[in-house]
């Protein structure tokens, strides 16, 4: 048991070192096109690490210490909502399974999460797309809103097991254009009426 624990710890240390090195390369590449993320006037402090749990997602970015200069107040009826569009501390976590992929795919994931640290880029809206487009054009990345796990595994010469529907999912949804499957526990009629496939924009249908 101790040997297994030591082996897993060593593997995680190797992944962590690789992650830090690739992050440094991303920082240098951004600097080469005029984006200095070490400039605290532009962006807050960024810390990057492996995710503690091996989640299905590629990575995530958590924010702390909101910048009062970027405070946004919106009103809806009698209610007032406060949001912040810049944070002084940002914490990026990358899933361990991502670290098994090609370096270019790992860097693409890192760059995606770095963009979320920029002001007004908490979501995948206009500002996120602007930065992603600029980075893709000038550095040859492929930063997008969604990743394609199956294709990324193939590019990395790794076997990918296509997930099948399980008892946890009541509804199986298929894109009529590209054939991708999505699984949901609940069904809303607006899903097929107003939503489209995140990969190709095709219409969705419920499979029986």
Q: What are these regions, as identified by a protein language model?
A:
Residues 3-108, 117-208:
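Active-site-proximal or metal-binding-adjacent scaffold patches in catalytic folds
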Residues 113:
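Walker B catalytic acidic pair
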């Amino acid at each position: 048991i101790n040997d297994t624990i030591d082996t897993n710890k060593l593997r995680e240390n190797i992944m962590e070192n690789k992650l830090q090195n690739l992050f440094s390369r991303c920082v240098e590449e951004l600097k080469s096109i005029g984006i200095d993320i070490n400039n605290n006037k532009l962006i807050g402090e960024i810390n990057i690490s492996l995710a503690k749990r091996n989640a299905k997602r590629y990575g995530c970015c958590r924010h702390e210490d909101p910048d009062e200069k970027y405070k946004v107040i919106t009103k809806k009826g009698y209610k007032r909502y406060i949001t912040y569009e810049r944070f002084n501390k940002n914490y990026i976590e990358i899933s361990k399974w991502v670290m098994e992929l090609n370096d270019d795919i790992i860097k693409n994931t890192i760059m995606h999460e770095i963009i979320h640290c920029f002001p007004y880029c908490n979501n995948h809206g206009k500002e996120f797309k602007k930065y992603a487009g600029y980075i893709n054009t000038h550095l040859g990345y492929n930063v997008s809103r969604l990743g394609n796990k199956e294709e990324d595994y193939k590019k990395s010469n790794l076997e990918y097991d296509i997930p099948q529907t399980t008892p946890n999912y009541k509804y199986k949804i298929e894109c009529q254009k590209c054939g991708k499957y999505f699984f949901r526990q609940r069904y809303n009629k607006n899903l097929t009426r107003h939503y489209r496939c995140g990969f190709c924009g095709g219409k969705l249908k419920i499979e029986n």
